[in-house]
Amino acid sequence: MSKSPSQTTVMVVDDDQAIVHLVAGILEGEGYRVLQARHSDEALDLSAAYKEDIDLLVTDVKMDPFMTGFQLAQCLRLMRVEIKVLYISGFVEDEMVRWEVESRVATFLQKPFRPQDLLEKIRSVLA
């Protein structure tokens, strides 16, 4: 049985602050607890502080020059193996992004997206 939104913590990571705020606002409106980060280093700091609480990582695929969303997810899984991940990106046409998503059988949502599409994906990932 999955947790209710009020018992679920989601970390949102994207180098575009507008996307972070958009996703956080949608999720908070549904009752989710949200942690926000713009870069991988912020996300890693937050994950160290909240590692037992983070249920879902929503991350951009291509972020900062230090780490991709895939690499960030790998790092977080070392701390919390059961963390779920939803990748978001506006660069699906990029062959590397497509290969990485398909090879991991990952859950992916292409930007731009509608709020209801985001919520459906999140519910699906958490189920």
Segments predicted by a language model, with ranges:
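Short acidic/polar segment at the start of the alpha1 helix of CheY-like receiver
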Residues: 16-20
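Charged docking surfaces used in two-component/phosphorelay signaling
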Residues: 21-29
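Acidic, metal-coordinating helix/loop segments flanking the phosphotransfer/catalytic sites
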Residues: 36-56, 96-97
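Acidic catalytic/metal-coordinating carboxylates
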Residues: 38-42, 67-72
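Active-site residues of response regulator receiver
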Residues: 60-61
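Alpha4 helix (beta4-alpha4-beta5 surface) of REC/receiver domains from two-component response regulators
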Residues: 67, 71, 78, 82-110, ...
